[in-house]
Amino acid sequence: MDEDSEVTQPQDQSCWATLPDVCLRRVFWWLGDRDRSRAALVCRKWNQIMYSADLWRYRTITFSGRPSRVHASEFESALWYVKKFGRYLEHLEIKFLNPYNAVLTKKFQVTMRGLLSCLGKSNNRLRSLSIQHLELDRLVWRNSIRGSLIKSLSFFLKKMGKHLDHLSLKGARLTVEQGCHILNSLSYMRNENVASELNIEDFFSHHLAVYGSSQFNKAMATFHNLTFLTLNYNCISDELLETLSENNAGTLRTMNIKCHVHDPHGQVVWGMSWAKLARQASNLKVNFFFERVMKYERLARILLQEIPVRSISLRSCYFSDPDWSMRPTLTDLLPTFRNTLQKLTFEFNNNHESLDEQLHLLILACRKLFYFKIWAFLDVKFVERILKSQEEGQCSLRTLKVRIYTNRYETNEEDRTLREIYRKYRKLIDSELNYFVIAYPMM
């Protein structure tokens, strides 16, 4: 239909024209913006359906960080959408993908200023906001552009903070002062905020010892309803744990903590601080994600026995260190959490030492373990040993994912053995496991 045609009500209506509203809304739900606009021209009833609130509650707005004719209208389209349907928004996700230069970051900043201003005036129901991976410490963000964007975001959060239940600013990469300014904006209308989910992983730039900042601890003290908290280990301190114990003991359920090799992580955190938090927040489970922090001495300072650890991920990518050994971590440290560990993820280069036996014993020791994923140098028979233990009821895995590194280009022999193992345990695998095993040349 020509977009210039008037909205008409045909005399001879088809069954489509008499569809119940609930069915029409379902049809519109699956249409893209362009098709929705065209469908709204069919008749008056369809035009009214176009403005149904439930069609516009969830929105992901993606901006390309590369100059392109194809993506030229993204910024204008985003503003048009917010002006037209922003009042219905409840969940908003904004993505700005790898900005190429300062021209595009400036365009994004100006668009965000208009978008957030319009949303702040028309919307009173926004519950979830996610703006991830801005990486504001990159050179493409000039100081003036970065400052203007932070100012717009802070002003918006001051106005909308009383409604927001979920906020994710993962990967913003701010200074401590900038980050705390944004966090304080959430509690501007009152001295506390109602957010239950907060994701500030990589919120601060690398190399910052946030744990020593009184500004950060004061900002976190305004949160009184946290259920899920995601952050970096360079934010963890006795003072933060004390604050969480006092203000969020009745609500806090999950903490996700990332520890990167480039983030300061040598601070002393007392086990008694973790013990108090675990005692008062009795349903708390903590998930750790380590990136290239692999040495036993460092891990032992962080993974204290008082922490109710649910999940541990240890990734070193492809880095190899012949002076490093994973064995003490597997035999002495991780079994400490045998009564709480449910998920284990490993990715490391252990070409210099065999760990099959230690890994197998760790799986058997952790009776609540249901998820096990590993990329490492292993014997193919390691998989068969795990499946045999599963068959005998010695472990209760529901997910088993293994990438077996080899030092050969050809993996024909390993592939043949893995096929034989699968045939032998096919009934067990099909009935109990999310199973993925592969041999992978590591050259």
Curated annotation (Swiss-Prot):
Keywords: Ubl conjugation pathway. InterPro entries: F-box-like_dom_sf (IPR036047), F-box_dom (IPR001810), FBXO31/39 (IPR045048), LRR_dom_sf (IPR032675). Signal peptide: none annotated. One of its GO terms (cellular component) is SCF ubiquitin ligase complex. Residues 13-59 form the F-box domain. GO terms for biological process: SCF-dependent proteasomal ubiquitin-dependent protein catabolic process. PROSITE patterns: FBOX (PS50181). Disulfide bonds: none annotated. It comes from the Eukaryota. Substrate-recognition component of the SCF (SKP1-CUL1-F-box protein)-type E3 ubiquitin ligase complex. Directly interacts with SKP1 and CUL1. This is F-box only protein 39. It comes from Rattus norvegicus (Rat). The lineage of its organism: Eukaryota, Metazoa, Chordata, Craniata, Vertebrata.
